Each structure stands twice: as structure tokens, then as C-alpha cells.
Amino acid sequence: MRGILIAIEGINGVGKSTQAMRLKKALECMDYNAVCIRFPNPDTTTGDLILQVLNKMIEMSSEQLHKLFTKHCSEFVAEIAALLKLNFIVIVDRYIWSGLAYAQADGITIETKNTFKPDYTFFLSSKKPLNEKPLTLQRLFETKEKQETIFTNFTIIMNDVPKNRLCTIPATLNKEIIHTMILTKTIKVFDNNSCLNYIKMYDDKYLNVQELNLFDFEWQKCIEDNNDKEEYDDDDFIV
């Protein structure tokens, strides 16, 4: 038995952070253990550095930036695994799908090793932000052309996500409707898949959450090849 990893994805400015925090608070009010992790995470050195680049405070090559984001995601493997072992619903406000979509917009291939495939992904679908910023306030990647390219990349990536692990929601829907859809589906996914012990890594290996030692966090010892993991077969995942 373990918790679940929920990803909320989409281009900049479509309400991901709002929905992620609302989901966390609603779950806690219903006595579920829930935590929200934002990427980039401003509370870490790596995340803060990425945000400085995005806010155009410092410069960095595109290749360095995208590789740094993937490294940043991998820094949270032990923390996410521990939370899953403790039966938390872990909500990630952006994750590896964002890393891929944004890197591909710059024609860059990134390493996805040491990252998880989310148990379930909510994709807030929109080609443009709900409220466009003035040019002077735009962060890196927030030009109209770049966001449209990133949106196209997202749609291609999401086409490869198993349909029973993905919910695409028009970002222009009423916020209350979006929240209700996300909350209802998250609870259903959690309640229907409480028997899971493994979580799939992006390289198609598996991490045995139940074998994780919370005292040493040596999660590498819990990695197994993808044989005999019938309990985690995509066709058997219940939503």
C-alpha cells in the first residue's frame, strides 16, 4: 500500500498552482494526507537558481537550464518516495512532462533518469495564458510564439500517456468546475489503487516503495527491473 503521485501540467498562466493548492487544502479537509511540491521549488538552491533565470535576473544557456530542471526534479526522488510510503497524496505543480515540453521547444533532449512517471496527470489545456502579461513583465518562455510551441509539445507528450492515467481539462472552464473535476478524480484514483507497492520510473524501472528505509533514504536499493509487476500494469490501473 502506498500513496499516489498526481501531476498538474500545462503552459504558464493556466491556473496550475491555484488548482494544486486548492486540491491539497480540500484533501486535507477530508482527512487525506496531502502535500504539494512546486517545480521549480523556490525553497531549494537549484529551484531558486532556475527561477532567477526564468525571471531574467541572470543568464544561462538553454541547454544548461533544461538539464538543471531535470536535475531539480531528480533531487526530490527520495522525498516523494518517502511521502508515498507514508500514504500521502503527492501533488506536483509541474514535473517531468514540463521538463520535456519546454526542452523540446528549444530543440534540446534531456535526461529523464531518476524521475517518476506520475500515477495520474491533469493537463490544463490552453494555447495561451488565461491572463496575458505585458511584454515587460513576461518571464523566459512566456512569449506567445514560445507558449504555442510548448502547448503543441505538451499535446504530443500527453498522447503517449495511457488514457486511464490522464485527464485533459480545458483551462478556460470555470475554476470551480476544474477544481471539482480534479478533486473527484484524485480521490477515486487514490481509493481504487490502494494496493499498489511500486511506482514506475521514467526509464521503465520500478521503485518498490514498501522496501524504502525511511532512516537512510537509499532509494536506489529499491529499484527493480520491469518484470513481474502485474500490479502496476497500465491496463489494470483503476480510475
From Swiss-Prot:
Single GO MF descriptor: ATP binding
UniProt xrefs under Gene3D superfamilies: P-loop containing nucleotide triphosphate hydrolases (3.40.50.300)
EC number: 2.7.4.9
Pathway, per record: Pyrimidine metabolism; dTTP biosynthesis
Residues annotated for ATP binding in this entry: G10, I11, N12, G13, V14, G15, K16, S17
Reaction catalysed by this enzyme: dTMP + ATP = dTDP + ADP
UniProt keyword annotations, A-Z: ATP-binding, Kinase, Nucleotide biosynthesis, Nucleotide-binding, Transferase
Keyword Transferase attributed: yes
Enzyme class: transferase
Role summary: Catalyzes the conversion of dTMP to dTDP.
Name of the molecule in the record: Thymidylate kinase
TM ranges: none
